[in-house]
Amino acid sequence: MGEPVLTRVHSLRERMDSTLANHRNEILMFLSRIESHGKGILKPHQLLAEYEAISKEDKLKLDDGHGAFAEVIKSTQEAIVSPPWVALAIRLRPGVWEYVRVNVHHLVVEELSVPQYLQFKEELVIGSSDANFVLELDFAPFTASFPRPTLTKSIGNGVEFLNRHLSAKMFHGKDSMHPLLEFLRLHNYNGKTLMLNNRVQNVNGLQSMLRKAGDYLSTLPSDTPYSEFEHKFQEIGFERGWGDTAERVTEMFHMLLDLLEAPDASTLETFLGKIPMVFNVVILSPHGYFAQENVLGYPDTGGQVVYILDQVPALEREMIKRIKEQGLDIKPRILIVTRLLPDAVGTTCNQRLEKVFGAEHAHILRVPFRTEKGILRKWISRFEVWPYIETFTEDVAKEIALELQAKPDLIIGNYSEGNLVASLLAHKLGVTQCTIAHALEKTKYPDSDIYWEKFDKKYHFSSQFTADLIAMNHTDFIITSTFQEIAGSKDTVGQYESHTAFTMPGLYRVVHGIDVFDPKFNIVSPGADTSVYFSYKEKEKRLTTLHPEIEELLYSSVENEEHLCIIKDKNKPILFTMARLDNVKNLTGFVEWYAKSPKLRELVNLVVVGGDRRKESKDLEEQAQMKKMYELIDTYKLNGQFRWISSQMNRVRNGELYRYIADTKGAFVQPAFYEAFGLTVVEAMTCGLPTFATLHGGPAEIIVHGKSGFHIDPYHGEQVAELLVNFFEKCKTDPSQWDAISAGGLKRIQEKYTWQIYSERLLTLAGVYGFWKHVSKLDRLEIRRYLEMFYALKYRKLAESVPLAKDE
C-alpha cells in the first residue's frame, strides 16, 4: 500500500480557471444570467436562485462531481455586475475572504485585492475613479506584531488565546517577568498602595519574600484574618489585596510562585482575575429614555436598557464579593451615564441622579446634551445625536470626577454613540475600555455603506459608521452576546465581520477595518433578571394578584388606546410576541403570516405587544408600521382572534404575562429580520414559554432547534406559519410535546445564560486586558494616534454636518 501523498491546495482562482477551461458553455450561460441583471449588486439569495434555475445536467458538469462551483456560488456574499465584468466577494469561512472578477465575454478570471474590489464596487455609484485619490483606512499594520489566532473556533475566545500568548512570553527568563512585577507594584486605591510596596525591587526578591511569607502562613489557622499579620507582611513588601484570610492569601501566593516558576494560561487568568483592579465602573448609554420605570416601548428604549439594568446589580454583587475576598474595605461604585431629558414625558429622565433598584452603590447619572445656545430639552433619535457627543463627553468627564472623586477603573460603552463617548473618555483618562455594540446598524440596513448618501439625510450613517470604526479599534476588549455578532455563521456575515472591508464612495474606503480573529473579542452572554423572570411552574413565586390586570389586558371586550381588537375564544393557546414596532423587528410581517394561515388562526389566538397607540409617535418607522398594522387588521378581518396591545413598561407584570401565556400552553415568537442577541427570547425561555425565534442573529445560538425551541426564517413566512401549525397540532394530540420544549428551554438558560456567569467573566476580562494594556502600551499608542487623526479630520466634520435639533 502506497504512502499517503500531501497535495497542494489549489487557490480559488486556479479552481475557477480549471472549471472555465472544462465547461466554457455552461459557465458562459450561468454568468450571462448574472450579467443580464444589469449594473448593480446581487445578494446571495439572488445568486442561488440563478444557480438553481440551470438544468441538473449543467450543474453536474459545473461541479465536476465535487460540488466545487456550487460551493463558490454558495460562498459568494455579493456579486458586483458591471458588464462585461462580474466581481465576486467570496467568503471561504468566517473572517476569510477572497475577491475575483470574471470577464463574461472572454471568460477571463482575475484575482482582486481588497482595494481593487472596493474600487470596482464604487464605480456603481460614482463611475470610474482612477484619477481620484481616495482615503483608505487600514488598521492591519498596527496589529501586525500582535498575536492573533487563525482557527474559527478561536473567534470570540480572545482572552483564552491572550492568556496562552502572555504565559508563553513569560517563559523567557526573569526579565520577562518584570512587567508582572511592575503591574503589581502599580496598584493603589485613592493613593493607598495595594499588593506590593517598594520594598520588593526585583523578581528574585519577590520570589524570596513569597516563600518566606508562605512558610509563615502555613503556621496559621486557615481562617486567620489578614489584619492579624498585616503589619508583619508590610515590612517585607506586601500590602493589602492578596486576600481576607490566611487561606486566600496562601492560594494567591502559590499561584504567583507557580507563574514565576512555569507560567501557564489557566493560572495566569485565575490570578489576574483575583487582583483588585475594578472599584469604580462607568457605563455609557446616552440615547433613548434611560430610566427604571415607564420607559420600555418608548422610541430607542428597549433591550439595551433592560440589559444594563439587569447587568448592574449582578456586576455590583460580584464586585462586592471579590473586594471582600481580597481583604479590602472598599465600597464599589457603578455609574450608568445617560442623557438628561428636561422634557421627561412622565419619566425620571429629568433627574440628575437616580439610585439603581437592587443595588447599593450604583446610580444613573444623567448629563444633558447642550450647545452654545443652551440645553436640548426634548428626546431625539439615536441617529441624530452626533453633533452633541463631543461636548457631552467633556461634561461627562467633569460629572464622573465629581461623583467618584477618582478615575474610573473600567469604562463600558453601549451602542455606537456610547462606545464613542467611552473611547474619548478612556483615551483622556488612560482607563481600560470595554465595548458592547448591541447592534451595528450597517448589517441591519443592506447596502447602507455603498449607497450611504441615500441614507444619510435620515440616518446619518456616515457619522455612525465612522464612530463604530473608531470605537472598535480603540477599545481594549469587546464583549458580544453571540458568535454570530462577531463572525456570523457558515452562510451569513457577522456584524463585526461586515466592517472588515467596505466603502462609502466619495467619503473613504475601509481596506481593513476590524479583524474577527482579533483576541479583543469575547463572547459573554447575558441572562434575564431571575427575580422577574422565572418558570411558570414555580407556583409559590407566581404573582397571581396581577392576573386580573393581565386578563383585562388580553381578553377584555373594551377597545381603546391600550388594546385594539378582541379575542373571542379564550380557550385557545396564545401566540405571543413583544418588541419595538420598527422595520427590523418585523411585527407586522409576523401578523401577516398569521393572517394568511387559516389553520394557524383556527388553532391559536395572536397577541402582539408593540408600539404606543396612547400617544402620537415621532418615530417615522413606527408611524409606518402602525399604518401597516391597521391595514392588516382590516384586510384580513383579524378582530376576534387578535389583540394588539400598546407597549408595556412594567417589567414585573411582563414577567407574569409570559408565565400566564405559558399557562394557556401558548408560545413566544421573535420574528425579527435580524436580532443581535435576543433578550426577549431569553426572558420567554426563562419563564418556560416555548420559543420560535429568527435564525438571523443571536437567537440561532440561544436555541437548539427542536430541543429548546425552534429557529424560523423571517424571509419565508409561509414556512414559519406551517412550523407553528405543526407544533400546535402535535401539542393538541400529545401535550408532552409542549412540556418537552418548555423544559428544554429552561435547561438551556440555566446552563448558559445567567447574569452571575456574565459578571464573573466580565471582571476577569477586565483584569486580563488591564494587564495586556500595561505590557503593550507603546504599541497601542501608535493606533490611538492614527485614530486621533481620523477622528479630528473625518468624524468631526461628519458630525457637524448633522442638523441640530430644535426644541418645539
From Swiss-Prot:
Mechanisms controlling activity: Fructose acts as a non-competitive inhibitor with an inhibition constant of 17.2 mM. In contrast, glucose inhibits uncompetitively with an inhibition constant of 4.3 mM.
EC number of this enzyme: 2.4.1.13
Top-level EC class as recorded in UniProt: transferase
Alphabetic keyword roster: Glycosyltransferase, Transferase
SUPFAM superfamilies: UDP-Glycosyltransferase/glycogen phosphorylase
Tissues with expression: Expressed in stems, in roots at different developmental stages, and in flower buds, flowers and maturing seeds, with the highest levels in strong utilization sinks for sucrose such as growing stems and tap root tips.
Reactions performed catalytically: an NDP-alpha-D-glucose + D-fructose = a ribonucleoside 5'-diphosphate + sucrose + H(+)
GT-B glycosyltransferase, as annotated region: 277-754
GO biological process entries: sucrose metabolic process
Pfam families: Glycos_transf_1, GT-B_Sucrose_synth, SUS_EPBD, SUS_N
Keyword Glycosyltransferase annotated: yes
Molecular function GO labels: sucrose synthase activity
Keyword Acyltransferase assigned: no
Cited PANTHER family: PTHR45839, SUCROSE SYNTHASE 1
Functional summary from the UniProt entry: Sucrose-cleaving enzyme that provides UDP-glucose and fructose for various metabolic pathways.
Family under the similarity heading: Belongs to the glycosyltransferase 1 family. Plant sucrose synthase subfamily.
Subunit annotation: Homotetramer.
Protein name per the record: Sucrose synthase isoform 1
Lineage: Eukaryota, Viridiplantae, Streptophyta, Embryophyta, Tracheophyta
